[in-house]
Amino acid sequence: FGFEAFCRKCAECGIDGVIIPDLPFRDYEKNYKTIALKYDLRVIMLITPETDEKRIREIDAHTDGFIYMVSSAATTGAQKDFDNRKQAYFKKIQDMNLHNPRMVGFGISNKQTFDAACSHASGAIIGSRFVTLLNKYKGDAQQAITHLKEDL
């Protein structure tokens, strides 16, 4: 299918940003950035607690859209809360004064984790919890969204 055809299809569908988790930043810069920009498509880069400051600043300088702050190296899904170490990570990134907005993802499932994430970021990404609610309400997105909003 190819990356350019993918970007073209995204643009035709109204998609303006994608996450390609296993795409190394250097490969993006060298092989994909020009094509993505041609279709006004943002490639969202992920950072983790293990990503060093130099790499974070490099990502911030060469991308737009937002930076996806992965809350942990664990798999996505519900967490009861964010411990002090994760809070310190969120604060450290906030204090870097990046030009891109920062969104926290992985483990956002309730008001407590949502509020904790938003206290040091521009917002939170809720994936697994939303999929769980879609399954619960048999694909009724409106019911799932209503329930999710009540939870938060």
Describe the function of each predicted region.
Residues 51-62, 97, 108-124:
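Catalytic cores of alpha/beta
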Residues 1-23, 150:
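Active-site beta->alpha loop and helix N-cap motifs at the rims of alpha/beta catalytic domains
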Residues 10-17, 36-43, 61-69, 119-124:
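Glycine-enriched alpha-helix->loop->beta-strand junction motifs that scaffold or abut catalytic
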Residues 103-108, 126-128:
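Glycine-rich beta-strand-to-loop/alpha-helix junction loops that act as flexible
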Residues 1-5, 22-38, 52-57, 76-91, ...:
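Active-site-adjacent beta->alpha loops and helix N-cap segments on the catalytic face
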Residues 14-28, 42-51, 70:
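Catalytic beta/alpha-barrel core
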Residues 11, 33-37, 87-98, 145-152:
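Surface-exposed amphipathic alpha-helices with a cationic face
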Residues 36-46, 94-105:
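Short beta-strand/loop segments at the ligand-binding rim of alpha/beta enzyme cores
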